[in-house]
Amino acid sequence: ARITAVRLVAELGDLRRFSTSAQIDAFVGIDPGRYQSGEKDSSLGITKHGNHIARKILYRVITQMETVKATQPCHITDYYDKKKRSSNRQGYKKIAIASVHKLIRTMFALIKHDQLYDYNVATENKRL
């Protein structure tokens, strides 16, 4: 886990340089793509523009969190499990990317407010 954290910091740099978590999403390449032509407007999958290494690390973090959820509870794995149970049509990769987005928002909020992660606070505060 420490090696993963070091690799992630090496790829993302200081998260304080971003104004919003959406900017981090775009930097990593998990922001939603859009197609517009005339009056047609459709949403695509993720853009994949950005740091592909950071995107892979974050994806692997979600899978690692899933394996240790029994001993180390996290609101992100709770979210992943809830989405997995409620959606028969959505694939696990889409759910994992949604969880990556939630992880980015959580990391950004914790760094912005200079706080440590607390599972009890995270489950009370649904925005994290």
Predicted regions and their residues:
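Low-complexity, acidic/Ser/Thr- and charged residue-rich accessory regions of DNA metabolism proteins
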Residues: E39-K40, T77-L128
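Phosphate-backbone recognition surface of nucleic-acid-processing proteins
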Residues: R2-I3, R7-N88, Y92
